[in-house]
Amino acid sequence: MQHYVTPDLCDAYPDLVQVLEPMFSNFGGRDSFGGQIVTIKCFEDNSLVKEQVELDGKGKVLVVDGGGSLRRALLGDMLAEKAAKNGWEGLVIYGCVRDVDVLIQTDVGVQALASHPMKTDKRGIGDLNVVVAFAGVTFRPGEYVYADNNGVLVSPSPLEMPE
């Protein structure tokens, strides 16, 4: 597992990276994570999140535009454990998570706005691999996202940690 330090990436690639507005917190078991972006756009319905974490996620990060909702959790312990089992590097969720005491022990990166104990409805509503924008940054499927306890950033191409 590669370790990323976002301040070092910003210093090495200042003209390449976009940094998300500082509103995310680390809820996962990895201090840092990075990979190719897979996007979901949904609102208080995590049906597509459930579908995606059941697929192979090696080298990928699931970026979920949950509309910034603070009323439902888009990720909990069971889906996080599936994501870890299927090799996902992490998830960036513009929304809430739950089961935070278990998430912090799960081998997957999770950046989200807050915790909330209420689960979502599963109505099968949402869009997969569409361009999404939140926190002042646009996320395009196939680009790259990197996160640690300092913040989250996006790059159009893969980045190497400087020596």
Curated annotation (Swiss-Prot):
Keywords attached to this entry: Lyase, Metal-binding
UniProt-annotated binding residues for substrate: 76-79, 98
Listed GO MF terms: 4-hydroxy-4-methyl-2-oxoglutarate aldolase activity; metal ion binding; oxaloacetate decarboxylase activity; ribonuclease inhibitor activity
Catalytic activity, as annotated: 4-hydroxy-4-methyl-2-oxoglutarate = 2 pyruvate; oxaloacetate + H(+) = pyruvate + CO2
One Pfam family hit: RraA-like
Residue runs in coiled coils: none
Cofactor(s) demanded: a divalent metal cation
Family, similarity comment: Belongs to the class II aldolase/RraA-like family.
Protein name, as recorded: Putative 4-hydroxy-4-methyl-2-oxoglutarate aldolase
